[in-house]
Amino acid sequence: MSSSLLTDLVNLDLSESTDKVIAEYIWVGGTGMDVRSKARTLSGPVDDPSKLPKWNFDGSSTGQATGDDSEVILHPQAIFRDPFRKGKNILVMCDCYAPNGEPIPTNNRYNAARIFSHPDVKAEEPWYGIEQEYTLLQKHINWPLGWPLGGYPGPQGPYYCAAGADKSYGRDIVDAHYKACLFAGINISGINAEVMPGQWEFQIGPVVGVSAGDHVWVARYILERITEIAGVVVSFDPKPIPGDWNGAGAHTNYSTKSMRSNGGYEVIKKAIKKLGMRHREHIAAYGDGNERRLTGRHETADINNFVWGVANRGASVRVGRDTEKDGKGYFEDRRPASNMDPYLVTAMIAETTILWEPSHGHGHGQSNGK
């Protein structure tokens, strides 16, 4: 089949011949980092997730169920436009349930939605901005794009936000992803080349509550699809190359209504104090392999210490100069790894800063979110 005919068929506009649309159902797989999807035909356009049919998949093939009881049910939660099929076709972010209606253990969205629907959390309108770093790897050899085979490029310095064939690798993928996310209706706010060559970042936000997780996951899915087309592998490993190279994080910027209002800086300081008290619990939920990244070098704080500061990129939590000057604003949690689950991280930050109350100054207080 000629490639031009294939391209024509892939780009067929269905609206001329049928009202039917294609819905690509997306879910998080058993590793907590793999994105799975499959498509089905709908009789016409749908823009409300509650009007979409539930569906199922073989959970024994994704590490989410056993072979003798393998059915997992998909509940549609958020709809985005499909940048690949275009037209009225859609991407659908789903979460996963057992046939009895209970959320399965890997369904972090369920608990996040519960925390974000708590009246105290809702009243605070938590905003998130997530900086998703990732590394582009050459297929088959798992070595960063633009790096010599079995060798290393020159040391870090020239690559961050750089242009030029000797410094910037994979920009076509990054730009395709940026535009595809905007087309999809994802609140992507920017992109940049990172400190390590072959590493890039996109930013999602500001997005309120559980939607932040939906936007990050669908943006990751779109990136996986684009790199698939380009024949490149995307890695969310927090430290893909050992040694004197920057790791990959998912810095999470956060503010509540109280923090954005006059006197907000005091609220921010109290929230950061609470985060420090629960440092260990947060680190446990902030991504696998993070200890390889949070070493106290390469713009990170040591994983065992909680430090915060104004404009300090070697801190666990950073407050911007503007926030300090204005007496209100937001802060940045720099601890989450690039492979973190945004549902888990965003909900945990809201729970600790809004619902959790320390008991006698120790890190094991109660949350009012039960």
UniProtKB/Swiss-Prot annotation:
SMART domains: Gln-synt_C
UniProt superkingdom: Eukaryota
Keywords assigned: ATP-binding, Cytoplasm, Ligase, Nitrogen fixation, Nucleotide-binding
Pfam families per the UniProt record, alphabetical: Gln-synt_C (PF00120), Gln-synt_N (PF03951)
Keyword Hydrolase: no
EC number in record: 6.3.1.2
Family: Belongs to the glutamine synthetase family.
Record's subunit section: Homooctamer.
Protein's UniProt name: Glutamine synthetase cytosolic isozyme 1-3
Gene expressing this chain: GLN1-3
